[in-house]
């Protein structure tokens, strides 16, 4: 399964950018309150709706960071199940579908334990100093469950009147 991911935040950034879905422009939401930086490029899957009412979040493993607004054709290799103050907030873990350097990454167990722990740690602490915000990490699931969530998110989007 391949899909498009729109990047909002490049790897290494402490700025949290979001696409304004009404104007199509990129807005600086905030600088992270903690001293952590995004461990991968971060964005969303086009034409989806996650459990939190926003497009489904996606992390993209790349050697070099891209830029806000960059569109990348991806495939999922797993998903980090988590919740925040608004409810379910799952994060897909993806790789560019045309990059031969990541061809060996086909499922979550192909990602090193340390890399998974680094991503998990980021999401467990990145909101720590923000008033009224909270995060609860859960666990990693594999490609099959990630792809099932993508399908559910496409359906939620369509059921809400998306095209």
Curated annotation (Swiss-Prot):
Stored InterPro entries: Pyrophosphatase (IPR008162), Pyrophosphatase_sf (IPR036649)
Alphabetical list of SUPFAM superfamilies matching this protein: Inorganic pyrophosphatase (SSF50324)
Binding annotation for Mg(2+) 1: 52, 57, 89
Coiled coil start-end: none
EC number(s) reported in the record: 3.6.1.1
Reactions mediated catalytically: diphosphate + H2O = 2 phosphate + H(+)
Name of the featured protein: Inorganic pyrophosphatase
Source organism per UniProt: Streptomyces coelicolor (strain ATCC BAA-471 / A3(2) / M145)
Organism placement in taxonomy: Bacteria, Bacillati, Actinomycetota, Actinomycetes, Kitasatosporales
């Amino acid at each position: 399964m391949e899909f498009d991911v729109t990047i909002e935040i490049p790897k290494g950034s402490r700025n949290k950018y979001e696409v304004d879905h009404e104007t199509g422009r990129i807005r600086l939401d905030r600088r992270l309150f903690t001293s952590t930086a995004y461990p991968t490029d971060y964005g969303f899957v086009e034409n989806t709706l996650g459990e939190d009412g926003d497009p489904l979040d996606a992390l993209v493993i790349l050697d070099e960071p891209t830029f806000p607004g960059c569109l990348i054709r991806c495939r999922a290799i797993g998903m980090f199940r988590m919740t925040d103050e608004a409810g379910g907030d799952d994060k897909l873990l993806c790789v560019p579908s045309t990059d031969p350097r990541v061809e060996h990454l086909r499922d979550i167990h192909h990602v090193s334990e340390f890399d998974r722990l680094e991503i998990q740690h980021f999401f467990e602490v990145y909101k720590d100093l923000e008033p009224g915000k909270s995060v609860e990490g859960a666990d990693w699931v594999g490609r099959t469950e990630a792809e099932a969530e993508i399908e559910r998110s496409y359906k939620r989007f369509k059921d809400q009147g998306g095209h």
